[in-house]
């Protein structure tokens, strides 16, 4: 009997369409957070890459009666720092947990979302891009995490209902010490620009 109840509960949760899964890939940029936001994105001198998988759960739909959805999210990332000979490690892993809000714009039978997330990031080693930022600056595995994104519903674009709520987009992964508030990291940090595929289910 308990297995039947567990199955029914699982099916009910799936039917609620409250989950998200995002696969992203990108590169480090030498641009600051502000520069990336205004579209001034410069390639880093080294080919540092990231591959990440983020899962989310919808906490509130249309929060405050606005077209804004709130998710709690967690992610795992792999950073490839092998392009830098002095890297502390060629393979570095990251875990993140954060709250993210999406502002929804519905027009022309499609949906565009602007997303902003805030949370924490922990890496298995110090990222090479952070070591190169300022070699005299304090470093930390544990830093503040910001996730900014813009995407559109690919399923609606091609008018294929089974792929509705499948988003293609651009995201920024940002780690920093918030000007010294976290572990005395004042000017270090990293920015990675990524493209991604995200599915709500």
Enumerate the language-model features and the residues they cover.
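Transmembrane beta-strands of outer-membrane beta-barrel pores
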Residues: 25-31, 57-59, 74-80, 118-124, ...
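Membrane-embedded beta-strand positions of outer-membrane beta-barrel proteins
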Residues: 21-23, 70-74, 114-118, 168-170, ...
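Short glycine/proline- and aromatic-enriched beta-strand/turn motifs that initiate or cap beta-hairpins
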Residues: 15-60, 198
């Amino acid at each position: 009997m308990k297995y039947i109840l567990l199955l029914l509960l699982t099916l009910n949760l799936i039917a609620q369409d409250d989950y998200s899964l995002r696969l992203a890939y990108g590169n480090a940029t030498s641009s600051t957070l502000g520069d990336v936001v205004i579209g001034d994105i410069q390639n880093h001198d080294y080919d540092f890459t990231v591959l990440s998988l983020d899962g989310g759960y919808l906490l509130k739909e249309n929060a405050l009666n606005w077209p804004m959805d709130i998710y709690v999210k967690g992610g795992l990332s792999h950073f490839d720092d092998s392009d830098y000979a002095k890297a502390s490690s060629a393979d570095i892993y990251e875990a993140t947990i954060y709250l993210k809000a999406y502002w929804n714009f519905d027009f022309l039978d499609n949906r565009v979302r602007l997303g902003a997330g805030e949370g924490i990031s922990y890496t298995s080693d110090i990222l090479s891009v952070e070591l190169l930022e300022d070699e005299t600056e304090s470093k930390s595995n544990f830093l503040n995490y910001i996730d900014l994104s813009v995407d559109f519903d690919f399923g609606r674009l091609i008018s294929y209902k089974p792929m509705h709520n499948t988003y293609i987009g651009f995201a920024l992964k940002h780690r920093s010490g918030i000007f010294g508030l976290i572990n005395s990291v004042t000017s270090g940090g990293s920015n990675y620009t990524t493209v991604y595929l995200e599915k709500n289910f």
